[in-house]
Amino acid sequence: MEKINAVITGVGGYVPDYVLTNEEISRMVDTNDEWIMTRIGVKERRILNEEGLGTSYMARKAAKQLMQKTASNPDDIDAVIVATTTPDYHFPSTASILCDKLGLKNAFAFDLQAACCGFLYLMETAASLIASGRHKKIIIVGADKMSSMVNYQDRATCPIFGDGAAACMVEATTEDYGIMDSILRTDGKGLPFLHMKAGGSVCPPSYFTVDHKMHYLYQEGRTVFKYAVSNMSDITATIAEKNGLNKDNIDWVIPHQANLRIIDAVASRLEVPLEKVMINIQRYGNTSGATLPLCLWDYEKQLKKGDNLIFTAFGAGFTYGAVYVKWGYDGSKR
């Protein structure tokens, strides 16, 4: 029996129209364009600022584009998985809302929460479902409305984040392409350094939590930066060595777009030139679970069948990991 691989067959993306520039940020908090560009690498970010729109709105836009590009029949979709830290509601899942918006009748749907590592977990989960032989066509979506949890009076966090979504079609194949390997790790000791203090079952919403601004993202930036550089660099080098990849045969590195200095550190560890590294943080900021697929969306035209791609990310938990993908189609023809 031939081995079943899971291959990405298409990419769709969406970012909101509203552009929040560094100049606007500098009018909200004590900062400036030079500091933000030097310390973070973000020039502007997109914000979903229309009343009553949430993560599923962006996810639908991205997934709809994906289905059109891949000429997919809604009845053929077996599953929809959404990675998000900012769901529309605590329940039902954003994925179930997305199923309805896409008119999918035969799919099962669920969310997963791995913060900025969400897309790595999506690829691993979809690959496992495909490998079971019971599922052939799965939509995976990384989507986050980070503006919904950012305090725009906090100069340490508000310049970093933006909103966006991107979706990939993952299908079964017997060809030697697709999601080839992954290394995923969790260090639960990261809780104190990156979290939202209230809103869950430990500290439910109340007048007190709202008054004390406990529903915003909290981050100890220096600690997170140190862990991110170390773990992303190490795990990326490990998966490369494990699969016989090096600076000569790695075609693209796709790092989580959290900070340009972290991206530089990962590229340096692999000795890969920045020309081989997908970077769009300057335009979108950190969109959490959407950063990796948004990179694919931006760079799709440059991808060639057989390209070796290494994805790597680090997020709250702490979660971190790397995924090796052998690209399955010529992006210039899409």
Curated annotation (Swiss-Prot):
Entry-linked SUPFAM superfamilies: Thiolase-like
GO cellular component: cytoplasm
Example of a GO biological process term: secondary metabolite biosynthetic process
Enzyme active site: C116, H256, N286
InterPro entries, per database record: ACP_syn_III_C, ACP_syn_III_N, FabH, Thiolase-like
Major localization listed first in the record, in broad terms: cytoplasm
Reaction equations catalysed: malonyl-[ACP] + acetyl-CoA + H(+) = 3-oxobutanoyl-[ACP] + CO2 + CoA
Subcellular location, record wording: Cytoplasm
Domain notes: The last Arg residue of the ACP-binding site is essential for the weak association between ACP/AcpP and FabH.
Role: Catalyzes the condensation reaction of fatty acid synthesis by the addition to an acyl acceptor of two carbons from malonyl-ACP. Catalyzes the first condensation reaction which initiates fatty acid synthesis and may therefore play a role in governing the total rate of fatty acid production. Possesses both acetoacetyl-ACP synthase and acetyl transacylase activities. Its substrate specificity determines the biosynthesis of branched-chain and/or straight-chain of fatty acids.
Protein name: Beta-ketoacyl-[acyl-carrier-protein] synthase III
Organism the protein comes from: Phocaeicola vulgatus (strain ATCC 8482 / DSM 1447 / JCM 5826 / CCUG 4940 / NBRC 14291 / NCTC 11154) (Bacteroides vulgatus)
Taxonomic placement: Bacteria, Pseudomonadati, Bacteroidota, Bacteroidia, Bacteroidales
